Amino acid sequence: MRIMLLGAPGAGKGTQAQFIMEKYGIPQISTGDMLRAAVKAGTPLGLEAKKVMDAGQLVSDELIIGLVKERVAQADCEKGFLLDGFPRTIPQADAMADAGIAIDHVVEIDVPDEEIVKRMSGRRVHPGSGRVYHIVFNQPKVEGKDDVTGEDLAIRPDDEESTVRKRLDIYHEQTKPLVEYYGNVAANGQTKYSKFDGTQSVASVSEEIVVALS
């Protein structure tokens, strides 16, 4: 099952991504992780990306698409994969379709901006693993501690309100158009599209996702 997650920063994508990966046994594909792995492995695309990054430039969509294509061909993606945070723009989505990277199901988690601002200030992260908690909505078993390791949780600087609002502006400008884009792709029967109310509890959203994906 090839799944793509859409939603604003703070909509709860990280928590649902973790759930989907465990439930369906598929890897999450993050472009940042992919870039680092390709550079470390010294693949031709990795060396090309390193050259660009060392020069302080942005890695082109073409190069990223090449890396995604390489990544989804690996053995652990045989049962599918989860794309979160990519594509971010319509040109990237077009390039991905042109490269023959098909998506079976687009999952959108929808949350109003003001709710996101409120949520972010209560977010806590385990720096080692990236596991995300919330002091109200998704509490750790022990306050301030990671469930798995027992290590301290931290507040990320980009959970500050001004930063959150800036990120939401960028999301609405660049990524929100993908909602309409993939809605049209689904209308043409090339993928399935499901939208979920992300203001519900984490468990409710997870349950609805399972029903939609089954």
Curated annotation (Swiss-Prot):
Catalytic activity: AMP + ATP = 2 ADP
Main localization category: cytoplasm
Gene Ontology MF: a single term: adenylate kinase activity
Record InterPro entries: Adenyl_kin_sub, Adenylat/UMP-CMP_kin, Adenylat_kinase_CS, Adenylate_kinase_lid-dom, P-loop_NTPase
Assigned EC number: 2.7.4.3
GO CC terms, sorted: cytoplasm
Positions annotated to bind ATP: 10-15, 123, 132-133, 200
Pathway(s) of this molecule: Purine metabolism; AMP biosynthesis via salvage pathway; AMP from ADP: step 1/1
GO biological process: AMP salvage
List of residues binding AMP: 31, 36, 57-59, 85-88, 92, 156, 167
Keyword Transferase: yes
Region: LID, residue numbers: 122-159
UniProt key word Kinase: yes
Compartments where located: Cytoplasm
Region (NMP): 30-59
Quaternary structure and interacting proteins, as annotated: Monomer.
Role description: Catalyzes the reversible transfer of the terminal phosphate group between ATP and AMP. Plays an important role in cellular energy homeostasis and in adenine nucleotide metabolism.
Family as reported in the entry's similarity comment: Belongs to the adenylate kinase family.
HAMAP family to which the protein is assigned, alphabetical: Adenylate_kinase_Adk (MF_00235)
Entry remark concerning the domains of this protein: Consists of three domains, a large central CORE domain and two small peripheral domains, NMPbind and LID, which undergo movements during catalysis. The LID domain closes over the site of phosphoryl transfer upon ATP binding. Assembling and dissambling the active center during each catalytic cycle provides an effective means to prevent ATP hydrolysis.
Protein name: Adenylate kinase
Organism: Shewanella woodyi (strain ATCC 51908 / MS32)
